[in-house]
A protein has these predicted regions:
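Conserved alpha/beta-hydrolase catalytic His-Asp/Glu region
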Residues: 127-129, 145-196
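Short beta-strand/loop motif that positions the catalytic acidic residue
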Residues: 209, 215-217
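Conserved alpha/beta-hydrolase "acid-adjacent" motif
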Residues: 221-227
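Conserved HGGG/HGGXW glycine-rich cap/lid loop of the alpha/beta-hydrolase fold
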Residues: 7-62
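Gly/Ala-rich beta-loop-alpha elbow adjacent to hydrolase catalytic centers
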Residues: 94-98, 102
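Catalytic active-site module of serine/aspartate enzymes centered on a nucleophile-bearing elbow/loop
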Residues: 237-267
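Active-site loop/oxyanion-hole signature of alpha/beta-hydrolase fold enzymes
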Residues: 41, 50-93
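Flexible "cap/lid" loop of the alpha/beta hydrolase fold
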Residues: 103, 107-108, 112-145
Length: 267
């Protein structure tokens, strides 16, 4: 069941389900609990899962100011949510934006993190590349000015994206279904704001992470394999797996859940 909590200037939608060790699942940019339902339900077979819609995503109320989308803000939201539900310590797992948010909390409050799983990182702690920042900004502006159809049209103008969608047309349908779960102005602001924010900022030190870390790299334009490899090198003792990209969603989810379960069992 969805609950809502006001944390300063934003309100988050969240839920807790399943049974077993406590695990926090953090979705990626442009996703939400509904979009990650298969992952959340799979994890809930082995863990007590706290999942939430990040600020401005999904059922969380809109946040339309792009300046309010930073990793410092996302981390503050997550720490506030954990305080509210009374979780002092848990396994942290997340994809892309969610993985970077979880890693930031692991640097800010290391005692809170029992184990850390970073899936499909987009960078090794830096903001996105200038090209990706531009592409995300143009995508956000397309949503603002022309809605979802304009956004799809812009995506298809990017050669790498057009090739990927041509090889798997179902991905385009899934993306459209994902986007319509959000307030358009809110997700446009998120697409512009987050890529320009760096998870690893001055004052933070990856060496402060005390939890065991597993890195699951991606293998696409936004989440290049090299980024995952760089993250694994950056964090002392981190374990690196092979990417799951290129397989059907059902198989990808099954592999992700099994990999997380096995890693947590080991630590």
């Amino acid at each position: 069941m969805t609950s809502f909590v006001k944390l300063g200037e934003v309100t988050l939608a969240y839920e807790i389900g399943g049974a077993g060790p406590r695990l926090v699942w953090c979705h990626g940019l442009g996703s939400c609990r509904a979009g990650d339902r298969d992952v959340i339900d799979g994890l809930a077979q082995h863990f007590t899962v706290l999942s939430f819609d990040a600020r401005g995503h999904g059922e969380s109320p809109p946040v339309t100011d792009e300046a309010m989308y930073t990793y410092a803000a996302l981390s503050l939201d997550l720490r506030g949510l954990l305080d509210l539900v009374g979780w002092e310590r848990a396994v942290f797992a997340g994809a892309s934006m969610g993985g970077a948010t979880a890693a930031r909390v692991a640097m800010e409050q290391p005692d809170r993190v029992q184990a850390l799983i970073i899936a499909r990182p987009a960078s090794a702690g830096t903001a996105a590349s200038d090209r990706l920042q531009l592409l995300f900004r143009l995508e956000g502006e397309a949503i603002r000015n022309g809605g979802w159809d304009a956004a799809i049209g812009f995506l298809m103008s990017i050669p790498e994206a057009a090739t990927a969608f041509a090889s798997d047309p179902g991905r385009l349908t899934a993306l459209r279904e994902e986007w319509v779960r959000h307030d358009p102005a809110s997700i446009a602001a998120a697409l512009i704001g987050i890529p320009s924010s760096a998870p690893l900022t001055p004052g933070l030190d990856v060496n402060s992470i005390t939890a065991r870390v597993l890195v699951i790299p991606g293998d696409d334009l936004i989440h290049p394999r090299e980024a995952g490899e760089a993250v694994a090198r950056l964090i002392t003792g981190a374990r690196l797996t092979e990417p799951f990209d290129g397989v059907p969603r059902e198989e990808e989810t099954r592999k992700l859940v099994a990999t997380i379960r096995e890693f947590v069992h080991e630590v």
